[in-house]
């Protein structure tokens, strides 16, 4: 058995008038995350964690923000590519542990929907997905959010 651990991080600034999407779930209609794609920072962090565990290039190198193909692209496309590479290398996801740091929106009311979405996207049971919402407690300016994710991959 071979185990690999990956860590992913992403942060985006809030912008008015854009849909906020986290983990493939529409959360807020009045403000979203600034980004070249749909700005789903949670899926970006998960994608980077998987790519990192596999020793691959990171999401920004593979899906450059200067490439018009990725303008407003759904972030699930990036995740699907990482999962494809993972599968080709013979790995499966054992579990993921994610943290969203933001003063707004509150994550708790959306937690189960996000976990259900991640379960479908990743092809693993919800019980193997940990999702936590944390507040910045006065640290930094609070005009965006940060997502971090650790993934454990296993090859039998």
UniProtKB/Swiss-Prot annotation:
Keyword Metal-binding applies: yes
Cross-referenced Pfam families: YgbB (PF02542)
Domain of life: Bacteria
Protein name: 2-C-methyl-D-erythritol 2,4-cyclodiphosphate synthase
Residues annotated as binding a divalent metal cation: 10, 12, 44
Binding site for 4-CDP-2-C-methyl-D-erythritol 2-phosphate: 10-12, 36-37, 58-60, 63-67
Cofactor comment text: Binds 1 divalent metal cation per subunit.
SUPFAM superfamilies in UniProt: IpsF-like
GO biological process annotation, one example: terpenoid biosynthetic process
Organism of origin: Aquifex aeolicus (strain VF5)
Enzyme class: lyase
Site (Transition state stabilizer) location in chain: 36
Subunit organization: Homotrimer.
Catalytic activity field: 4-CDP-2-C-methyl-D-erythritol 2-phosphate = 2-C-methyl-D-erythritol 2,4-cyclic diphosphate + CMP
């Amino acid at each position: 058995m071979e185990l690999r651990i990956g860590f992913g991080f992403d942060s985006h600034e809030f912008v008015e008038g854009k849909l906020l999407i986290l983990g493939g779930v529409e959360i807020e209609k009045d403000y979203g995350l600034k980004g070249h794609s749909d700005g789903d920072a949670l899926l970006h962090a998960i994608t980077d964690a998987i790519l990192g565990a596999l020793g691959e290039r990171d999401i920004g190198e593979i899906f450059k923000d200067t490439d018009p193909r990725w303008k407003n692209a759904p972030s699930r496309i990036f995740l699907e590519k990482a999962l494809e590479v993972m599968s080709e290398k013979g790995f499966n996801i054992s579990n993921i542990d994610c943290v969203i740091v933001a003063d707004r929106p509150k994550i708790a009311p959306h937690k189960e929907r996000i976990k259900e979405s991640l379960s479908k996207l990743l092809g693993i049971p919800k019980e193997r997905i940990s999702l936590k919402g944390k507040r910045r407690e006065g640290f930094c300016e609070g005009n965006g959010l940060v997502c971090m994710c650790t993934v454990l991959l296993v090859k039998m």
